[in-house]
A protein has these predicted regions:
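Chitinase-like catalytic core of GlcNAc-active glycosidases
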Residues: 43-45, 80-197
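Catalytic domains of carbohydrate-active enzymes, especially glycoside hydrolases
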Residues: 58-84, 136-140
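Substrate-binding surface in catalytic domains of secreted glycosidases
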Residues: 155, 159-260, 271
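C-terminal motif of bacterial Sec signal peptides marking the signal peptidase cleavage site
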Residues: 36-38
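Short, well-ordered beta-strand segments enriched in hydrophobic/aromatic residues
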Residues: 344-353
């Protein structure tokens, strides 16, 4: 084994360092500091904002705000809507609940993307809205314009923003919602230059194969967007699912995401798909973009605030776990329990343990010999070489701690204790 060199050699090295005015100890310390500085620090978590998109502030909304106030930096609150018929609707928040959070508020004005002439919009009304909101004991940080216009109309949108910015209180920031579809437009840079901040929306209904959120595509959009703006910006990420019906012509016939809808020519005649934002997928995406540290990216805006009454959003517990970057643990099991009314009839249920809403399993199987069965709530009866099973026909999430009935079994000739069901991925 080597002893690290002879004594004369070590003396020659020390003499050379001394001649240069460098002590061996200083050299060692320099090397250590270089190695330490070369180690990358863990990325700082991006701050969490959230959209309150509910038009009616029900007890479930105010309760969700109260339970989430410690995890949210800024609330983006739907304040007004201008629809395609040129009607103007104001939303009335629960001011006491909003003020109690002590968090900054961004008032969002949604302008229908089909409005072609923005010069007719009452800018004075938006300015007055900002003044009115400041009278309710909240900290109004910004006005956000949500206008999903066609790329060909960005120049007109830019002129509208310039006029609004000139009339808005300089202490209030002007921010906009930006779309990935705009990234190829030469008018985008000018548009973003007239806004103090922007929120890039990377979730949308595009086609059933892509789903509601594509992390690879979203990350590419973020990298490209960072090259177009010199102002701070955030990314909007989904906490919800949506049911989309596609017509025979391949176009979207109906979307059910914020509340149930009955469409006479939609769900009955088209092909429906349940598109779901998976908590594990979104959580992994957040970890990735925090490592990317893209220029100007200052936070996440979650769309939308989950509530106990919102069946199409994550549970509050799952959302908080994602907000705090906690490990997500999904655990779904199945059980069969005998009906109290009919001997031999067993109800089949899924039970979600863990701390996160979990994707519905693809197959539920039983080894019992049953005469009949059927599925409900996203499941249907099917058969394969191994026998009877309940197969998932619509994807979805089962909230943490919740139970869902998915079907029944009629097994009259079987010992009740031997009827069991199991989950197959």
């Amino acid at each position: 084994m080597s002893d690290g060199g002879s004594a004369p050699a070590r003396r020659r090295v020390c003499s050379a360092l001394a001649a240069c005015g460098v002590s061996p100890l200083a050299l060692v310390l320099t090397l250590i500091l270089t190695l330490v500085s070369g180690c990358s620090k863990p990325p700082a978590p991006l701050p969490n904002d959230a959209y309150i998109w509910q038009r009616k502030w029900t007890p479930s909304v105010t309760s969700a705000i109260a339970q989430s106030s410690g995890f949210v930096q800024t609330w983006h609150v739907l304040a007004a809507e201008k629809d395609s018929k040129d009607d103007w609707t104001l939303i009335s928040p629960d001011w006491a609940t909003l003020a109690a959070t002590r968090a900054p508020v961004t008032a969002v004005v949604r302008i229908d993307g089909q409005l072609g002439d923005l010069t007719t919009l009452p800018i004075a009304r938006i300015v007055k809205l900002a003044d009115d909101w400041k009278q309710h004991g909240i900290t109004l940080a910004a006005i956000e314009i949500d206008h999903d216009c066609a790329t060909s109309r960005l120049a007109g949108y830019t002129r509208f923003l310039a006029t609004l910015r000139a009339q808005l209180d300089p202490a209030i920031k002007l921010t906009i919602t930006a779309l990935p579809a705009w990234l190829g437009s030469p008018a985008l840079d000018a548009l973003l230059a007239h806004a103090d901040e922007a929120v890039l929306q990377v979730h949308a209904v595009m086609n059933p194969a892509q789903g509601l959120f594509d992390p690879t595509q979203a990350r590419a959009w973020l990298r490209e967007f960072a090259q177009h703006t010199k102002h701070p910006w955030r990314v909007a990420l989904p906490t919800y699912g949506t049911r989309v019906t596609w017509g025979d012509d391949g176009r979207v016939a109906g979307i059910e995401s914020e509340r149930p809808m009955l469409l006479a020519n939609g769900f009955a005649q088209g092909v429906a798909h349940e598109l779901v934002a998976q908590p594990e997928q979104i959580s992994a995406f957040v970890t990735r973009i925090e490592r990317d540290a893209l220029p100007g990216l200052t936070g996440i805006v979650w769309f939308r605030l989950p509530t106990d009454a919102d069946d199409r959003a994550w549970s509050l517990g799952t959302w908080r776990a994602v907000l705090t970057r906690a490990p997500l643990i999904a655990a779904i099991s199945a059980d069969a329990h005998q009906s109290a009314q009919q001997p031999g009839l067993f109800d089949v249920s899924l039970v979600s343990g863990g701390n996160t809403d979990a994707p519905l399993p693809a197959v539920i199987r039983t080894d019992a010999s049953c005469e009949a069965a059927d599925g409900i709530n996203g499941y249907a009866l099917d058969y394969d070489a191994h026998g009877m099973l309940l197969r998932r026909v619509q994807p979805g999430l089962l909230r943490a701690g919740m139970r869902r009935d998915i079907g029944w079994l009629r097994c009259g000739g079987v010992d009740n204790k031997k009827v069991s069901v199991r989950v197959e991925p």
